[in-house]
Every structure is written in structure tokens, then in C-alpha cells.
Amino acid sequence: MNNSVNDANGGNSSDPDSELPTPYERVSEFHEKYRDRAYLRLSTTHGERLREEYTREWTEEYESPGPREWDDPVKGQEVVRREAVTWGTAVLRTLEDYADTRRTTVNLEKGRPSDPEYQEWSVQAETRWFSSYQKRYYAQMKGWLRELCGGERPSGEYTESAYENPHVALVTLSASSVPNGERVGPVEHERVRRESWEDVYHTLRNTMRSKGYELGTDWQYDRRSEPHTGERGGDLNHCYGHDHIVIVVDGAVDAADFRPVVEKHVDTCKWAGETAHSLDKAVEVKAAEEVEHLAEYCASYAAIKPVDLLERPIEYVAWASAVNAANVKTVSRSNAAKHAATADACRQRAESAQCDQEHDHAEEVIPSSRRGYELEWAEWGSPHG
């Protein structure tokens, strides 16, 4: 298979972004609303990992004598200093790259032109900040929750819940952006806040196990980062990130059950404060049947919206530029949650007249090569159910 890339406009069409604000307009908004943040460098920590285009470098020319007297001197340039760009510059570069990608298509071909089954087609280039990408993630979350808690599929058919007594916990983990009275760069903040996750994960798993719940069979999770935007809380941390962990448990749980998890984050993350992580602020638990639109309820916490990046709140755009510069993941899920979402997609494809899928999910079983599973369903390879 070969592929090539070209401008979606072909150089002739009108600009598809004409109805959207420009990158420069959004950057101006960021500078106007958050001037104290716009001129911050993304990080001042030596050794911080950043994509090269989000750094500035200074070079000096040098000249060294040749190895032998009659050899010409060696001349060149060497990097003598490198630092992160400012947050405002990162916003501009992220939005410019995004706008360029919106105008780009990827041309694909399969086989050779002389082959009877030769095919060629084009697809829109895409990044994780596209509304189409966000829409897929939202569909996966809906499918996951539908498999565990039950619900109606787009076809009108109903999925029976895999869990008998599903409860949903939302755990929020954050960190101060002014830990010592001085505002820190967003990439440094992102790294420090996320460093607690390994310890938090093990504490969560062990806490659930102590209550008789095993990961995968009795509970699953979906962890997502999102920015502080002002919809909840004050403006001190606006534009900086925090994490929401959506946990679905097959059994009754309450906020106090997750106290060790929150305490582990506060203990491990040096910028996490106890006040912001009191149980009434950091944990919310509901029985799934109490929430009319469960996926919408969870998605509202996780900032999953099929909205163009250029139209997102400026706080979201600023946060996106920071995680883009650091090239960090903003989503992680338990394997069982991925398998459940895949099972839902399999059911929907089997019901769709536009797909030629032969079997529904769970109609045919084959041996599984996945660790910890003996069998999986033939279509799409999901062991869920």
C-alpha cells in the first residue's frame, strides 16, 4: 500500500476554515485573558522532554584546526543553549499545525494499477484534537458503559448489562499550578501531576481487591486528562490539566472506599493539596440506574466533545498545546474496558446494512492468544462477555 499527502483544497477551493476563528485570533484571546500564563515558558526544568518544534535553540560558530598542519580548519555551528518556548507561542504553533492538518488529505492506494483489484482513495488527515477523533472516543465510552451497565444501541436494540449491580465512581486528581507561590510552566505541571499515577493505580487495584473486586471481572476504569476551564472550581488552575478516573464497579461502593486512592495521590504528588482532595471534592459515586444519561454524565467530566479545536474554550486550547508539546497521552483504559468497547462496536457492525460482517459478537468462539484469556469471540477478537 502506498500513500501520499496533499492539500485538501488542491490550491483552488475556498478556505474551509473561513467560518472558524484563526489561530492568531485565538492566541490573541489567550494573551488578553491569561497574560500571566502566555509569557510563561512551557517548562524551566533541565532535561524536560519536549517536541523539538516547541523549543528554541542558540548556536555559535566554531572553528577547529585540522588534524594535520596542512589540513583546512573545521568550521561549523554548535548548539550552546536550548529552552522551551512560551505558552503563547506553543498555542500558536499547535493551532497552526492543526489548521494545516484540516486542509490535508492522505491519498492511499492498494496494489498496482495493473491489478484487477487495484484501489485508490483519499482520507482526511486527522489528529487527536479533531472533532471526528473526539466523536469516536465518545462512542467508545458509550459502548463501554452500555456493555457494563446496559442500554439501548443506535439500532434500537438493547444491550443487557454485564454487571448485576453497576456503580460508577468519578475520581478527580489535580495539582496546584502555584505550589510555592510562583506559577509553574504547564508541561512541568503536567509531568509532576502525572508522576503519581503508577502508585495511585496500584493503590486503586489493591483497595478494590481488599473489598473483593478483581480488575476486569468486577471493575474497570477509564482515565482521562482534561483542563481546568472554569466550569468547576476557581480560576487559579485554569488552562492546567487534571485527571478524571471513571470507575465502574459491579457492586455497591461509596466515596469513602476511594479514600486510600486520593490520599496516595496527595502523598505522592508534591503539588497536590489536601484541601482540593477532600472526598466531597475528589470523589463522586452513583448507582448506574440513578443516572439517566450515563455516558453524557461521564463525558461532561472528561471534556469529550465533538468540537473543532479552534472553537474550544481558550483554556482547553492552552492545555492542548501543552500536552501536544510534551507529546503525552491523555487517555488510558483498563484492557477489559477496551474489550467491552470493542464488543459494542462489533454488535453495531453486525446490525448495520453498510457492513458485511458475518457474525454478531459472541456468536463464534476461538482460542485466544491474549494473556489471561483462554477464549475470545471470532469477530474483532474481543474476550468481553
Residue map of PLM features:
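Right-hand nucleic-acid polymerase module
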Residues: M1-C239, G251-G385
